[in-house]
Amino acid sequence: MKNRLKVLRAERDWSQAELAGHLDVSRQAVNAIETGKHDPSLPLAFKIARLFNMTIEEVFHDEA
């Protein structure tokens, strides 16, 4: 699943560690989601969307 997480994080000038702190996950988890190696759980996807005041669909989209 593709996502805009890296762009959204960069717009706020946050490091991966800072974003991880906001989400209560590890920096490695943020990196795995940003690079598409891992899809977030549904609760985490909602948390990410809320953090950026967006819908899940605005942050994440299917690769198809």
Language-model features: where?
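Short basic helix-loop element that most often maps to the first helix and adjoining turn
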Residues: 3-22
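Residues in the recognition helix of alpha-helical DNA-binding motifs
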Residues: 8, 22-23, 33, 62
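Recognition helix of helix-turn-helix/homeodomain-like DNA-binding domains
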Residues: 25-38
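DNA major-groove recognition helix of helix-turn-helix/homeodomain DNA-binding modules
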Residues: 43-58
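Short amphipathic recognition helices of helix-turn-helix/homeodomain-type DNA-binding modules
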Residues: 58-64
